[in-house]
Amino acid sequence: MFEKNMKLAYLLDFYIDLFDDHTAAVTRAYYEDDLSLAEIAAGEGISRQGVRHIIKKCGEHILFLEEKLGLAGLQSAKNDALEELESIRSTLPFEVGEKIDVVITKLKGV
């Protein structure tokens, strides 16, 4: 359960803007602010069951989006490739290293 919550908290950064403001606020309060269902319910003026339903449905949609789009997976692969480039850079001649620095800077901006 904890592992799934950590994964969803990470995936929020990639997909939360695709949801309406209310769903995003409830889901962020749960995963990012670590509020209880009761605390969120009181703040949003809905029942705890309503909060649970929103969080469950939003989580399912986020996992579906990641399965289909793979944005978090792509970001992870990009970061791994950048780390590998940075480690290789130091073993190359200075001129080549400078060119690789330009590529790394461009990739970090994407």
Residue ranges and their predicted role:
Residues D21-D33:
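Short amphipathic alpha helix immediately N-terminal
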Residues I54-K57:
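Residues within the DNA-recognition helix of helix-turn-helix
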Residues V26, I40-A41, V51:
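Hydrophobic positions on the alpha-helical face of helix-turn-helix-like DNA-binding modules
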Residues G59-E66:
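C-terminal flanking helix
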Residues S47-R48:
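Helix-turn-helix DNA-binding motif, specifically the short coil turn and the N-cap/start of the second
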Residues L82-L85, G97-I100, I104-L107:
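Generic L/I/V-rich hydrophobic alpha-helical segments across diverse proteins
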Residues K68-F94:
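Intrinsically disordered, low-complexity basic tails/linkers immediately adjacent to helix-turn-helix/homeobox/MYB/SANT
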Residues E3-Y15:
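Short, Lys/Arg-enriched N-terminal segment that forms or immediately precedes the first helix
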